[in-house]
Amino acid sequence: MAASPVPGGGGAGAVHSSNAAGFTFDSGLEIRTRSVEQTLLPLVSQITTLINHKDNTKKSDKTLQAIQRVGQAVNLAVGRFVKVGEAIANENWDLKEEINIACIEAKQAGETIASLTDVTKRSHLESDGQVTILTDKTGVVQAARLLLSSVTKVLLLADRVVIKQIVTSRNKILATMERLEKVNSFQEFVQIFSQFGNEMVEFAHLTGDRQNDLKDEKKKARMAVARAVLEKGTMMLLTASKTCLRHPSCESAHTNKEGVFDRMRVALEKVTEIVTDCRLSGETDSSSVSIFTGIKELKVNIEALRENVCFESKENLSAALEAVLEHVEDFTDSAYTSHEHRERILELSSQARTELQQLLSVWMQTQSRKTKSAAEELELTVLKISHSLDELRRELHCTAMQLAADLLKFHADHVVLKALKVTGVEGNLEALAEYACKLSEQKEQLVETCRLLRHISGTEPLEITCIHAEETFQVTGQQIISAAETLTLHPSSKIAKENLDVFCEAWESQMSDMATLLREISDVFEGRRGERCDHLSLPKPTKNSANLKSLKPDKPDSEEQAKIAKLGLKLGLLSSDADCEIEKWEDEENEIVRHGRNMSRMAYSLYLFTRGEGPLKTSQDLIHFLEVFAAEGLKLTSSVQSFSKQLKDDDKLMLLLEINKLIPLCHQLQTITKTSLQSKVFLKVDKCITKIRSMMTLVVQLLSLCYKLLKKMENNRWGSATNKDTMDGQN
């Protein structure tokens, strides 16, 4: 930030390293941004060097000179810092007095440290009684504490200037929005909207910088969500306002417009809340503790029993479990949860209750017996309930993920949105009512699914993303219906049609974002977050050097882009399906599982490519990707063939038939990599994605079939062993 007097560096918690040196500063000065923390780090490092010198060792001239250089460096850095602080004070009269006081304190502390470290005149130390770092280390500690405290105050006051800029920018936008809301002519609207656009750009830059600077990941996620609403809302505000101006007496057009303005105002207030770190009066947290967090905290308290660190009362532990199980009812009460999942969840919930009571009973007995056997029994009961809670969490995860994946797959073609567009242009009010009802049903399904996903998301930022998705589906669903109603009432209106298109695109975009969210939740659950594109770190082949150009030539038109996006979404859904199948396997190191997981991750990378995201950028990247994917497919077929040798003839034949479908597709994909992608790029990319989609469909089927056959084989072995034991017993 502008107020930094010394180079930045370091990471979180750097400031607190000073405590180890025996000094602290004002604990009320909470540091919330990386820039402030990193600005302080070099100063902390220099002061720590001074404080940590050994008191009773003889100092060489070289050591004394080094101490003096550090002291002078600190004083010079503080001097530069004070000049910057004073300049900021002169530009911000409301903070001038506070900044100047802190600058004076910092300057005095810097001069004190410079004086105390002036120890090169060793011959005068004893004769004139000069006080130095060698004779008054306490004075240095006090000066260091004052210096860090005053410098931190200046930095935080300067940070308030940044906050003030964001709030001022927000206020300008709100004022312009009020003018936009009241405008009555197109000409006036265009002029004001141009100003609004410039203000939004400035606000986006300020909030983007702030988002990157925040230390708290939860706040960063909330800021990202609010900024996304504002970014997408700007286009919605434009088309909704134009529609209102064109059809001023249309009630649905006004409803549509009001929805956009309301949501943007809420997003602006959320930004203010985040940067000022205060919740608006009367506002409460929109979310309760998720099931994932509840189980995590409960397990920590249970582990404390094992270590005998503390004893949570029976009532407290039972209440904590009941709070978790109360949220579990969101799953069991949902009309979209399958009977099989519901029964399993209820069974695991009952099991957790029983095992907690058993644990509490065993713990009480352990306190009186204090024997090895009692300790072992306690250990066993702790392991049992921990396992039950993990199983419950896994079942909830599978339930929510499967529901979400099925829902995205079912609505991948956006049939209802297309029907609403057609009925609008036709002016068919009866059909509008029918499809509006269908969209409302779809919206309710998606909203409930997002609520369930929040419970199992695994991190606070992902929880916030789930809440955002829920709110977006809730609001956008209503706005699509009002926009469709406006078009149906005015079927020849180009502006009304454009407005409906914008809201439908926002819905489709959120559906696509939800597919990404599923993958991120899955990554967190399996502990493989950030490994999505690990195959791209493999050595890149040097052949096909003629294809090193970017994939920019022959830019596809909007229809081609839409087709690619649709194929990509289906590929993303297949990747989620594969993950769901993989989750069923207990042996994560199984060769079939390993190759299936690799192919799933790579398919997801290609899905990101269709959105213009991810690491796949050039034809070289894509060729390498296709080669690795085809090779991974052949490795999977090889592993499945090895597994088939353990099966009976009928099962073996069934599995080999599926393998024989996948092998030719792998070879065809290898053939594609040997041809240039530079000409007719769209057609070849389309062909590649279609081929990989077919392969992933077979991979999902193979994973499912192999799992079923594996379980069948294990059950047969267990049955044979049981029969043998029975026969042996009879003999």
Swiss-Prot record:
Q: Which GO terms describe its molecular function?
A: actin filament binding; cadherin binding
> Per the record, what is one GO cellular component?
cytoskeleton
Q: How does it sit in the membrane?
A: Peripheral membrane protein
Question: Which of the residues bear the PTM Phosphoserine?
Answer: S373, S537
The places in or outside the cell where this protein is found are: Cytoplasm, Cytoskeleton; Cell membrane
Family indicated by similarity: Belongs to the vinculin/alpha-catenin family.
What is the recorded name of this protein? Alpha-catulin
- Origin species, per record, is Mus musculus
